[in-house]
């Protein structure tokens, strides 16, 4: 109980500190989603026609999958972004591919690119086998040479999240990955601050301000080139099923990596990711 109370206190401090950061000189980017629509000067909405990783959703630009609420009733400081997965059988992409699910994905490519500093987001996430939301960063160019920083991923087991790096020689089932177990009494369905501190020689991941995993330049160079000296953009998305979830839950039906109970949660309208704010500092 003591650990839980300490974590809650730390989380409240982090939340307030982040909101205060928007007026400080070291703030590169701040978004607290307090409007009724997405700020398109800061964010791009992705529309996909061909998915990767055997994921089961298409990403669309719709107020059904990306919308905003008065976040206070959900525990957010001001407004909150909601990324919602929807069961929509027969959805056809512009390439003619059919999907049973649609969801949302946004990024800051060419609108906010940063090199080094700290990136963080306060999020609350639905759990369920195969629900795969993420907060991450990519460089421009071909993957994996561009470098990928997975600040937070979860594939439906609410008791843990993962951090990872992908680059040339260490991608896919990357050796540079860590699974962080939540303290007793909390899980992904509660509000947490997920962050990474990025320097010229290391990346340090944090959960509610606590260091969970550190990767150094020499660690990556055991496998390939250090791919973290170039500008990156942020991504928030909510994927469904696919290779990573299947590797954990071994589910193949009714959908690859996505369980029936999670499908039921999507159909009931309860598969949602809440984002209170996103902050980048130098």
State the predicted function of each range.
Residues 1-23:
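Bacterial Sec-dependent N-terminal signal peptides
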Residues 21-282:
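GH16 jelly-roll
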């Amino acid at each position: 109980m003591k650990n839980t109370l300490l974590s809650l206190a730390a989380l409240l401090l982090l939340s307030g500190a982040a909101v205060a950061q928007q007026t400080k000189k070291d703030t590169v980017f701040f978004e607290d989603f307090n409007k009724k629509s997405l700020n398109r000067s800061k964010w791009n909405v992705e529309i996909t026609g061909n998915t990767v990783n055997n994921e089961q959703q298409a990403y669309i630009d719709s107020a059904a999958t990306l919308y905003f609420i008065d976040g206070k009733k959900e525990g957010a400081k001001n407004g909150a972004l909601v990324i919602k997965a929807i069961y929509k059988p027969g959805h056809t992409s512009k390439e003619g591919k059919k999907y049973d699910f649609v969801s949302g994905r946004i990024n800051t490519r060419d609108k906010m690119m940063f090199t080094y500093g700290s990136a963080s987001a306060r999020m609350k996430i639905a759990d369920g086998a195969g629900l795969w939301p993420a907060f991450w960063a990519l460089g421009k160019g071909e993957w994996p040479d561009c470098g990928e920083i997975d600040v937070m991923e979860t594939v439906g087991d609410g008791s843990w999240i993962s951090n990872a790096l992908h680059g040339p020689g260490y991608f896919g089932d990357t050796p540079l990955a860590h699974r962080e177990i939540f303290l007793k009494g909390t899980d992904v369905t509660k509000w947490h601050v997920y962050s990474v501190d990025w320097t010229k020689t290391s990346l340090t991941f944090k959960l509610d301000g606590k260091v969970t995993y550190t990767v150094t330049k020499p660690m990556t160079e055991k496998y390939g080139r250090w791919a973290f000296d170039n500008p990156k953009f942020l991504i928030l998305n909510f994927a469904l099923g696919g290779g990573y979830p299947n590797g954990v839950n071994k589910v193949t039906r009714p959908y690859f990596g996505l369980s029936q109970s999670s499908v039921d949660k999507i159909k009931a309208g309860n598969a949602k990711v809440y984002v209170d704010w996103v902050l980048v500092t130098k």
